[in-house]
From Swiss-Prot:
InterPro entries: Ribosomal_uS7, Ribosomal_uS7_bac/org-type, Ribosomal_uS7_CS, Ribosomal_uS7_dom, Ribosomal_uS7_dom_sf. One of the primary rRNA binding proteins, it binds directly to 16S rRNA where it nucleates assembly of the head domain of the 30S subunit. Is located at the subunit interface close to the decoding center, probably blocks exit of the E-site tRNA. Keywords: Ribonucleoprotein, Ribosomal protein, RNA-binding, rRNA-binding, tRNA-binding. PROSITE patterns: RIBOSOMAL_S7. It comes from Acinetobacter baumannii (strain AB0057). GO terms for biological process: translation. GO terms for molecular function: rRNA binding; structural constituent of ribosome; tRNA binding. SUPFAM superfamilies: Ribosomal protein S7 (SSF47973). Part of the 30S ribosomal subunit. Contacts proteins S9 and S11. This is Small ribosomal subunit protein uS7. GO terms for cellular component: small ribosomal subunit.
Amino acid sequence: MPRRRVVAAREILPDPKFSSQTIAKFMNHVMQDGKKSIAESIVYGALERVQEKNKVDPVEFFETTLEKVRPMVEVKARRVGGATYQVPMEVRPSRRTALAMRWLVDAAAKRSEKTMALRLAGELLDAAEGKGAAIKKREDVHRMAEANKAFSHYRF
């Protein structure tokens, strides 16, 4: 293991419109090739669309939707005596959020709406209702962990 000091996590600046760190972090997940202004317009467009449809505070809606997508457990591969076991592990809070955001963006990208903002809005609305590809991904991960519960004594 490295003997250097542990590097402190960088402070993420809140987004300009809602002054929310979570939305700023989500923008960074949506961003491709460093084009933050495009990612910003996509996320704000999606949140406006959600606000039009549901008549709710977009930040609050986003937070609750993200909470529904966050995984509690996941499986990690662990080699024991030549065999590889899928060992269920609890997910630490920062990784839960990162996975949920990644799954939302990936699920939105695979949708068929015309613009990414519409796809993202659709995926957020679906996730809030407990359906959609991001929720399915979470359930698949939980199912894998449940199926491999027998190997939980191999924890790291």
